[in-house]
Amino acid sequence: MKTVFFLLLATYLALHPGAALQCYSCTAQMNNRDCLNVQNCSLDQHSCFTSRIRAIGLVTVISKGCSSQCEDDSENYYLGKKNITCCYSDLCNVNGAHTLKPPTTLGLLTVLCSLLLWGSSRL
């Protein structure tokens, strides 16, 4: 009985895909419409990234994909700017915008509600 159980378990694990992250992926594209290829990330890649390099305010080059160690970054250069954004859910790098994590969103909503209540009580 144990043998059958382990055989079924091994078959299930072999056939069942892991819960890998999916990110949009492209290299050196001029706009987001050209960055709609979906990439299945490896299990050690826990974030999606979008890299935008804007040169002289005229040309923007976009790259997207999976990353194992992503850090938001922004650097200004003499002739342009580089901006890297990271996110952590399936297909979250659709346009490179930051997505607020739930604790951040909850904190902002709490502050906003407090300000609204405080302001209405002073009227």
UniProtKB/Swiss-Prot annotation:
Glycans are attached at residue 40. SUPFAM superfamilies: Snake toxin-like. Residues 21-95 form the UPAR/Ly6 domain. Its main location: membrane. It holds the Pfam family Toxin_TOLIP. A lipid is attached at residue 95 (GPI-anchor amidated asparagine). It is found in: Cell membrane. One of its GO terms (cellular component) is membrane. It is a lipid-anchor; GPI-anchor. Residues 96-123 form a propeptide. PROSITE patterns: LY6_UPAR. Predominantly expressed in prostate. Also found in spleen, liver, lung, prostate, kidney and testis. Expressed in brain cortex; expression is increased in transgenic mouse model of Alzheimer disease (at protein level). Keywords: Cell membrane, Disulfide bond, Glycoprotein, GPI-anchor, Lipoprotein, Membrane, Signal. GO terms for biological process: negative regulation of ERK1 and ERK2 cascade. May be involved in the regulation of cell proliferation. May act as a modulator of nicotinic acetylcholine receptors (nAChRs) activity. In vitro inhibits nicotine-induced signaling probably implicating alpha-3:beta-2- or alpha-7-containing nAChRs. This is Prostate stem cell antigen.
